[in-house]
A protein has these predicted regions:
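Lumenal/extracellular ectodomains and adaptor appendage modules
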Residues: 54-547
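Disordered, charged N-terminal biogenesis/targeting segments of membrane/secreted proteins
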Residues: 1-29
Length: 547
């Protein structure tokens, strides 16, 4: 959608709808355990009449799973395949031999001291508390750590068959989320020397589904929850025609020609939480009037919304943060696209929810300014990015980090929110969900320039740590405790391959459950030649007892 068409796309919002999100306080967990409780995907809930508990947060989710499909098992959490390298522009003078090595070295336990673990946290102010926690959890001074990841070495011998030097731009694709880039981003080398790279990011590589997900999708249609790609065929559909990569290599939309009105709510205060006095979750509720046919409202930081299209009323609410809580001191924003809202007022309440009547003393500063959507979203994005970094969702503050995050945030809003003219239910409350932008899976490409001498060769190698596909521990399925890894031979690549081979470094840690590579550990067959007419190879393994 062109940005100057946006104002014409403002549509009617449902007459009355309420969505609330609980403010859950969590104890900080070890980094290795942070996402190990993803088994919470086993839970689903309905909140109130006409309300749905949105499973938000953008954390990599899973499907309902299944016994399998042609070409390997269907796992509840599919990590995506290893893709082949490609060129920015096809070159008939360049051919390639590919060798991929799957190394199970991360499965070998290594000792990690409590001091080493605490020192690895990005915020120095947190380290003593983290060390105290680890000393409590591991009084022996540390623990043995291993991983279900593998090291993938994806090597390409590029041959220049022409009489002239060939300078080409190689593109290496991989699956990740923004929050997991530190773990998943490959290193690229040519003839053993590190290459300078540019990172490109694709859009959300998935879809949306109803509140009950795959368990009864035929009964519960909708677009409330994220629905991730479940197998390699999903990536084949995503990448085959090249449009997804073309978008990733292009520029992000500029929204500076869309006028908006921005309301900033800051310095919020209120009666402190006091369970005995019935003040269980001090909350500020903001109410205003609007014409639903002429106005679109985006919001950031609020954890509850109310719509009343019949009476032309909308509400937003947030829990008053206390010092020490995440987002403490951060402002809240309402961005108005179209006709301005009217009669903005607020009041404090003892808890959240739109039926609460008991009030408390509360206050805040409200400022209003006229701006454009590009500038307004940049301010919101800076706040969201800073919060995500402080909470440890980003391990490193990449030089390209914010601008990439900001571009993807705009892209996500223009594709799926009410700004698109055909938004999904997940975002119909107008909330800017920065955690979705950070957490959803997408395909990235690393770009590097290489020169291959005339009539000669160059070796380009991508090394990365690859997560497994798996079923959640609580699932009690046939694939429980099985880790899956897979690769595709040609998908998305314009290279002319003359040969592809694969090697396995099992480290004495695994037994093969299912595969189509042809490895035979017992008989020493750890290197195989691949059939390039076979589009997909898979390896499914189980850990063996080495005690």
């Amino acid at each position: 959608m062109k940005s100057n068409d946006l104002l014409d796309a403002i549509g009617e919002v449902s007459d009355e709808y309420i969505a609330d999100a609980e403010n859950v306080k969590k104890r900080r967990m070890p980094r290795w355990a942070r996402w190990s409780c993803a088994a919470a995907a086993c839970l689903a809930a309905v909140a109130g009449i006409g309300g749905v508990l949105l499973i938000r947060g953008g954390i990599d989710g899973g499907s309902a799973g299944g016994s399998g499909h042609e070409g390997g098992s269907s796992f509840m959490r599919y990590a995506g395949p290893v893709f082949p390298m490609t060129l920015l522009e096809s070159n008939p003078e360049i051919s390639a031999e590919r060798d991929i090595t799957m190394d199970f070295a991360p499965w070998v336990p290594v000792w990690v001291s409590n001091e080493e673990e605490a020192a690895s946290y990005p915020l120095e102010s947190d380290r003593q508390e983290i060390l105290d926690n680890y000393n409590e959890w591991y009084p022996e001074g540390g623990y043995y750590r291993s991983s279900g990841n593998i090291i993938v070495k994806d090597s390409y011998i590029l041959e220049n068959t022409s009489a002239q030097n060939q300078t080409v731009h190689v593109l290496y694709p991989f699956v990740s989320s923004l929050k997991d880039l530190d773990n998943n981003i490959p290193s690229l080398t040519m003839n053993g020397e590190a290459l300078g790279t540019t990172l490109h990011a694709g859009s959300y590589a998935g879809d949306f589904e109803g509140a009950w997900g795959g368990s009864s999708k035929e009964l519960e249609e909708g677009s409330v929850n994220l629905s991730y790609i479940e197998n390699w065929e999903g990536y084949r559909s995503l990448l085959s025609d090249g449009t997804y990569m073309d978008r990733a290599l292009g520029d992000f939309v500029n929204l500076s020609d869309i006028p908006v009105t921005v309301y900033e709510f800051s310095d919020a205060w209120g009666t402190p939480e006091n369970d005995k006095a019935g003040v269980t979750n001090p909350t500020i509720r903001v109410m205003f009037d609007l014409d639903y046919e002429k106005t679109q409202v985006l919001s950031y930081g609020f954890n509850g919304s109310l719509w009343d299209g019949e009476n032309g009323i909308m509400g937003k609410q947030f829990s008053i943060r206390r010092q020490g809580e995440s987002d403490y001191g951060s402002p809240y924003y309402i961005i108005v696209v179209g006709e301005d809202i009217q009669n903005v007022e607020y009041k404090g309440y003892v808890t959240g929810g739109w039926n609460t009547e008991k009030t408390i003393d509360a206050g805040m500063t409200i400022s209003r300014r006229e701006s454009n959507l590009e500038e307004a979203l940049r301010v919101v994005a800076e706040s969201g990015y800073r919060t995500a970094f402080e909470m440890g969702y980003f391990e490193s503050d990449y030089d390209y980090g914010f601008e990439l995050y900001f571009g993807l945030l705009k892209e996500h809003l223009m594709a799926y929110s009410s700004l698109s003219g055909n938004g999904v239910q997940r975002y119909e409350d107008g909330a800017i969900e920065n955690m979705d932008v950070i957490g959803v899976s997408r395909v990235f490409w690393l770009e590097a320039e290489v020169t291959i001498p005339a009539g000669s060769y160059a070796t380009v190698e991508a090394v990365s740590e690859k997560e497994p596909s798996y079923d959640f521990y609580c699932s009690n399925t046939a694939n429980r405790k099985i880790s899956g890894y897979d690769m595709v031979t040609r998908l998305g690549s314009n290279l002319i391959f003359t040969e592809q081979t694969a090697s396995l470094e099992d480290r004495g840690r695994i037994e093969i459950v299912r595969q189509n590579f042809g490895f035979d550990i017992e008989n020493g067959v750890n290197e195989v030649e691949l059939d390039m007419e076979e589009p997909h190879y898979y390896l499914e393994v189980r850990a063996i007892d080495t005690e």
